Amino acid sequence: MERPLVTTAIPTLRDPQDRRLPRISPPCGLVFFGITGDLARKKLLPAIYDLANRGLLHPAFSLTGFARRDWSPQDFEEYVRASIEAHTRTGFNEGTWNQLRSGLRFVSGTFDDPEAYRRLADTVAELDRVRGTGGNHAFYLSIPPSYFPVVAKHLSDTGLNKRQGREWRRVIIEKPFGHDLESARELSDVISQIFDEQDVFRIDHYLGKETVQNIMAMRFANAMFEPLWKANYVDSVQITMAEDIGIGTRAGYYDGIGAARDIIQNHLLQLMALTAMEEPVHFTPEEIRVEKEKVLSAVRLPEDLAADTARGQYAGGWQGGDQVRGYLEEDGIPADSTTETFAAIKLFVDTRRWAGVPFYLRTGKRLGKRVTEIAVIFKRSAHVPFGNSALSESAQNALVIRVQPDEGLTLKLGAKVPGTSMQVRDVTMDFAYGHAFTEDSPEAYERLILDALVGSAPLFPHQREVEASWKILDPILSFWETQGQPEPYAPGTWGPQSAHDMLARDGRFWRLP
């Protein structure tokens, strides 16, 4: 593999006209638990470097890794550099690397080793003294939730959560935020004992994507959309997150979690809340959270969960030109596992704006393509003067917000087919970020890490949102536990037949992304 292009010039500060990330972090340190995991290696370390490469991290920024590895400082530097070189999106720059490297530290130890935390406390104090981090430190817990209590206890025992004066101490938590409502509350109790809620940042990386943030801009900055954004005109809303891959090497994490807990509880319900919420009074974290919480608290489950939910497991077979294994044949998966790799549910939002409008949410692995989108499907015209036979089969306008890949918007509408007779077919008008703007969109983790370091929280779910999401999902999960094995579906398709039947009973069908 060719090494990336390396430059040696010290990078200049960001372009003053770059208004996408207009803030620079204060002097601070970031302590990573789980620094050797895939997420840190492929996403988090490159995101930190790319922020530094764009001049968005203070020169005093420091990065401390905490792991069991018996690494020397040089070993850790080599690991961080290799991760950055393999996954940076802004190109490797020796000047940026040298600045970042001078703030790297590594503490070897296990999560339950008190002596390791004392060494960590000494390292943090040394960084304050020689690096100038100013007593400002964030602790990134990229670890399974089962380890949170022991890590939190040791952070408290060593005083690492304590701050003085205007210093700050924060904690950044990766999903899942619990396994159900009860465990989510227990997890919150553990964290809240040592950190204030305002200092807790729960990462949902989908909320850092440019298109997700554009939902609010599109709705509230354009007079043409908001008047139509209601039950009078909207037939239904479909929110899809599909992957075309299997679980890979994540069997230990995925089995027992499943598609609903992994994706619907956080990503899809957050997307639904942003789509359905009312305009906030002010564009502040608390005002946005309040409006999202109102949506989640207004969600109503369907009466017949057997008819209006669906779950499945991908089977083995051919996908594209490759023969792939089924979920039960994957390494580390029990032969009798009932964990779903596909989940679809129908929900209602009982507000004046959305009364009677179904929200269909679906997610799965080994589906037809990798795509995440929100499709707002409008009602058919009440009357057309040239007869229904002239219309295409669907004859419904739709506004599709593409979250990934190819971020942008698509508007589907009817247009006359050239010729003498009146025939109307569906056509699309497309907006793509990559074509409309010359700037690259920041990677989601860049935005979220910077937000956490500067203390801005509009894109981080509050504990109240987490609990509201589990209140929605728990009854569905409890019902599924009584239903035995999930329905198998062929790889490369769009899920089990029960998911298609769910919409067919309503006289609708899933949009093909």
Regions found by a protein language model. Give the residues of each.
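Secretory/organelle targeting and membrane-embedding segments
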Residues: 1-173, 177-513
